[in-house]
Amino acid sequence: MYPPAPDQSADFLKVFDEERQRIKAWRKNRGVPEDDGDGRLDLIGLAFSGGGIRSATFNLGVLQALAKLEILRYVDYLSTVSGGGYIGGWLTGMIHRLAGGMKDVEEGLDPSQVNQNNLPQKAIAHLRAYSNYLTPKVSALSADTWSLFSIWSRNTLLNLVTLVAGIAALILFGRFVGLTSMVTKWTAGFGWPLAAFGFAAVTLALTLKERLPRRFCKDSGVQQLVVLPALAGAILMTFHVHAHPIQDWVPGGMALSVLFLVLQLVAGFWGWFLHHHEQKMAAVLGGLLQLGVAAVSGFVTIWLFYAVSCGVQHYAGKPFAPWLVLTVGPPAMLAAVSLGVVLNVGLMGRDIPDSNREWLGRLGAWAMIYGTGWLLFFSVAFLGPLALKAGWSAFAAWAKATVTLAWVGATIGSLMAAKGAKTSGEQNGGTMNRVAVAGPWVFLLGFVSLIGLGVHELTLGPVKAAPPAASASASATAQLTQSGWTMTAIFDSQGGPAKVAVTPWDRYWGEMAVQIRSSLLWKNPYDQAGISISWYQGLLEVMLLAVAITLVMAWRVDINEFSLQHFYKNRLARCYLGASRKREDRHANPFTNFDQNDDFPLNHLDDPNFSGPFPIINATLNLSSGRNLAWQESKGASFIFTPVYSGYDTGRDASGTSTSRRMRVGGDADGAATPTGYYPTQLVAKTKYEPETGADAATALRFTNDGIMLGTTVAISGAAANPNQGYHTSTAVAFLMSVFDVRLGWWLGNPAGPKASSNGPIFGLGYTLAELFGTTSADSAFVNLSDGGHFENMGLYELVRRKCRYIIACDAEQDEELGFGGLSTVIRMCRTDFGAEINISLSQIARKPDNKPENFSGCHYAVGDITYADGTTGSLVYLKSSLTGNDEPADVLGYHSAVPQFPHESTADQWFDESQFESYRALGYHIADKALGDGRAPLSAAKTKQDFFGALKGCVDPPKQNS
């Protein structure tokens, strides 16, 4: 095993140099020349596309054909995505574990060999047996099937506890603040100055923005220093004007606040005038202008506050007043400040610098985001339960059932659409996309409303308890006085509401007010006169309990361990990596049928004696948010796992300039500044594993520094169902999938950051929120990884980055219309990011214009040309999972007759039967043999690689330039 370099982080140039060293050594181990003359490396890359078990099985046949044709030994790179990684992991595992390495594997894979007792043939038999790899025994009463439901429900329940407790804590906080404003004048004498200080943060930050540390100049820093204090000021001011009559605060409060605001506004622009107006008189006049503008805009802002306060005071005394104030007041106050700033900018005209106008404009955007978010959340939290209670009591039984089923149906439909292969995230992408776009919002509305209703009923519990009877009368009246208004709550002798004619509206707000007198954990809420002896202590108790539950669960319920990723990884390892071992070496647990030693650290392939191709396992670095505008469409970047280095090079700097393009022509000094995150795989993700069954119990669980496991990387590469999924990421869909733990992705220490060696965050609440709201980025300590197909599904991108001279691309993605979407995407990406032009004609593979499933292709493959930015050229051999109808084996065509969707059955079908498995394997073998063999002399007999690949023209039209 090669030791890690002293300088642990690396850019792509260093990574590529290390890979070339391994390739030379491993070529020698395979018995092929170390170079191609004059020290040149004409690299051959083999790419396996995504597509789940469909792709894995198709590419198994391709591997058998390559072994028979003696091409496999010449492959330098094996780049895999998703399902292609299943079979890629299987191949590299066998090469690593067999003493003869590639020689034994190539001989064993050749189906023409009569020896069916070698490891590769036994391994293929193992793959057939586990073609239902997720649940090998498919039955309604099978423990395998029920294990899937058991693990999913366990993880979902634990994650729901964290999420529901967190949302409940927010709702309880809102109620607590609202009730506080009803029972106390705690803002007396402090409300205006504190609020003014919060708003002054705007001008203070504007004054100091050029001197602040860089981290506070970003969006997150400005939110912390400006937007959040301004929001706090809006809340304080709202409740101040609600708790005090206007005449109490206008004289003194207004004078103090106007003075404070004016001084801050003057300070904000005085420095600019002194700098830009050199003459003393100009500076004085400029200062007077700013003072006058600040006075006018400050005066208008105060009167906007006054208008808002009049609206607030108008509803004083109403049962719903505190909740209306809490919901609408802070956003209205933020809007008043924003309008004042707009007036200030307008009156300053050309005398305010454009940079400040832009800064204030973006600040206004964040104020709108926070204000709108506040308004929507508390509207749903407070009005949602009312709508549910009132509607439920008014609806007939059939209407209740209809609404419930519609909500559940929208939720299930959204989940199916969100993870379906048809969902592309486009607005006009058909029914499935419309369901994926609208359904999650329907779920979100109902979900938060139900939590709000649960909070309401929970905190109402003590009110329903029987109060001590003050007399033998049938009812007792509790007079509750809150901040200047009185509400009468009538209870019968059993403690329930008296049967009086009240509307659901009045009853709901009455229940909200009565909560102020309840204590949930101890104390009877009523004294002998029926009056509360505890005000809002109970509400505070429950709020703190919800916060505690959220924090403890976020700490203990690991964001990685309690996703479905481990379920997925364990079954992939059992099927594909388990198949790469000798049967006598496996010691599976008799109850679970798992052997932890099926898997092994990826960096164990970084062995001087290894003889396989250099593996590249492709995943997607999800970038749903961030500063790089170039990725706002794809919302992701390529992330690779290799035995030597793992990480990413986004290919662009913060301005969107293609840094990979600067590197591609020789790696000059300009390319050294590439934003990159490559880290030695040996040090990536400290891994926890179990030794073989029967080992000493004291060492049954231990840690190793050998880095991330091969099975984990394959599972990450195939994590198709994930809240953040590159091109397909949607905020509402991300929230929905996170709630129901449809999460196959992984949070890994950012290879470009200080947590590069960490296997995941210890406290995952912030990352859970990032998953919920689709705000993942490469700027955090941990990055979110998912299916490589969420970025690029062919596995070609990284081979083109490495300028492979010859590439064999095997496309087994679901493409029933033969639209070649995956290939088209990667051609565009390679042109944009690397300046590489790929010219290939696909007309012979495409179906007739009507695209009917029964129409066959004219050919299975095409050959194209690659022109790299430095002028070097290469060849692309593209093998497409397709049918011509005239040369396939009879059993393959027979399966197509029985299953017309073949060979493009849904990726959601991960449960293959024997005939399905054999049909895809045989088709892959047939296509590769037809494209690369078909009576041609083997690659080993060719004088040069160019002679062999140059002869591969076959049945395709001459390549033509793509537009």
Regions from the language model: what does each represent?
Residues M1-A10, E18, K28-N29, E34-S963:
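Patatin-like phospholipase A catalytic core
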Residues K24:
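Interfacial juxtamembrane loops and adjacent helix segments
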